[in-house]
Amino acid sequence: MTEPQQQPVFVIEKVYVKDLSLEIPHAPQVFLERESPEINLQLATSDNVIEGEIHEVIVTATVTARLKEKDKVMFLVEAHQAGIFRIRNVPGNEIEPVLGVLCPNILFPYLRETISDTVTRAGFPPVILNPVNFEAIYQQKQQEAAVSQPDQPVDNTTRH
């Protein structure tokens, strides 16, 4: 008799803000500006094993609002949205896409809300982050890693 095949297990244990910072270097004068700022977004993901089947995934966004004409930063907000995930019975070759695509897709709506809420509470109009295709970013990183270092393990950090 064959042993029953164990089903993959994926559980969201916790979603939390790991780190959050806001800088308004030119307050209060910046609140008198009428120019619409240029918004720049930098996005990164990382993951690590906490223990055994428990993983932490972090999606980091740095949003900079700059007054282009005056080359002045209105505000800079950086948020690290994290999650703890229990992943069991997933084949080794499938764990990286779970950590690099599925988990960031789960965390991103929380990150978007954290950024928007922080910016609004700081006295600025909300910044709404557009959806991000983490699968495309993950695949691009895989291709870049395969071309640049075919014998090295892939770094899961993504930049957008």
Swiss-Prot record:
GO terms for biological process: protein folding; protein tetramerization; protein transport. Keywords: Chaperone, Cytoplasm, Protein transport, Translocation, Transport. The keyword Transmembrane does not apply. It holds the Pfam family SecB. GO terms for molecular function: unfolded protein binding. Belongs to the SecB family. It comes from the Bacteria. It is found in: Cytoplasm. One of the proteins required for the normal export of preproteins out of the cell cytoplasm. It is a molecular chaperone that binds to a subset of precursor proteins, maintaining them in a translocation-competent state. It also specifically binds to its receptor SecA. Homotetramer, a dimer of dimers. One homotetramer interacts with 1 SecA dimer. The gene is secB. The keyword S-adenosyl-L-methionine does not apply. This is Protein-export protein SecB. InterPro entries: SecB, SecB-like_sf.
